Amino acid sequence: MNLNFHGLNFYSKQPQKIFEFYKLLGFRVVQEKESDDYFGAALALTDEKEPVMWIWSIPEGKEQPCCNNLYFTTNGQVYEIYENIKSAGIQCPEPFKTFLGGTELILTDPDGYTILFI
């Protein structure tokens, strides 16, 4: 069986804010639907051949269904990513050295979920 990962769903009580945040991080907008009860938008996680992230609204009275934590490898460019995030106007803690000697950057999105860059 040959399966390919196509994307993931993000659910948020503030989907437009999440959408704008990830656009500021540099995610390419694949599709943006006019606001409705569901709010549908798709952002490319990397390039046009890679997976997408769909952003959906959590219906009134419902809880966040799951965790939305992302993990990215930077090919040794953690500090460059950090500078790009800062220049986009996003508050971001500085990268740090791990006990194994690598460098990591942990960012939190407006819903409080973790984005880890290594």
PLM ranges: what are they?
Residues 2, 9-51:
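Core segments of cupin and vicinal oxygen chelate
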Residues 48-53, 111-115:
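Short, charged/polar, Gly/Pro-enriched secondary-structure boundary elements
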Residues 20-22, 27-28, 44-46, 70-72, ...:
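General N-terminal targeting signals
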Residues 59-61, 94-95:
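Short, flexible, glycine/charge-rich loop motifs used to bind or transfer phosphoryl groups or to couple energy/partner
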Residues 1, 4-13, 32-33, 41-42, 60-118:
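Vicinal oxygen chelate
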Residues 55-57:
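Glycine-rich, highly charged phosphate/nucleotide-binding loops
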